[in-house]
A protein has these predicted regions:
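Two-metal-ion RNase H-like nuclease active-site motif
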Residues: 25-34
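RNase H-like nuclease fold core
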Residues: 33, 37-52, 58, 63
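Nucleic-acid-processing active sites and adjacent nucleic-acid-binding tracks
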Residues: 57-78
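Conserved residues at beta->alpha junctions
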Residues: 63, 91-92
């Protein structure tokens, strides 16, 4: 398993997340998998962004082998618990990331639960506003473009 951490010295978030949760207890969560079903696909990356001592950081746990799925899950949960993180913010996580993680936890027989966290699914919150905002779609890239985030994949 490989773990990386990066601190962004000059990054400032343009949005006040304290209206939704205490910024010091928030993890922005994303996972990467080899497919869409936990039963037949591997979880190979868990990544999160968080505020630490007034600076934004990212941490990633990367499974270099299939057998390391358990390690990255346990490491993520240990980090979240030790840091006192209570809220997960994600994009469409209610439909994919959280169920996938839950199924992997169960399959691996781990004594962990995602239910200990509050959750904010940005997709679910934005979805009812699609037409009001004039969004052509609810894809993450479309929403990023709408709020002025440009990225290249």
């Amino acid at each position: 398993m490989k773990e990386t951490t990066q601190t962004f010295e000059d990054f400032k978030l343009d949005y006040d997340i304290s209206v939704a949760a205490d910024p010091e207890t928030v993890l922005f969560l994303d996972i990467e998998t080899t497919g869409f079903t936990a039963r037949s696909s591997a979880l190979y990356l868990i990544g999160c962004a968080y505020l630490s001592e007034g600076k934004w950081c990212t941490r990633q746990w990367f499974a270099e082998k299939y057998e390391e799925e358990k390690d990255i899950i346990e490491s993520f949960f240990a980090f979240a618990k030790e840091g006192g993180y209570k809220t997960l913010i994600h994009f469409n996580g209610n439909q994919f990331d959280l169920p996938f993680l839950t199924q992997k936890i169960e399959a691996l027989g781990l004594d962990l639960t995602i239910d200990d966290f509050n959750g904010i699914d940005l997709y679910k919150r934005i979805s009812p506003l699609k037409h009001l905002l004039g969004l052509s779609s609810l894809k993450q890239k479309s929403i990023e473009k709408y709020i002025g985030i440009e990225r290249s994949d």
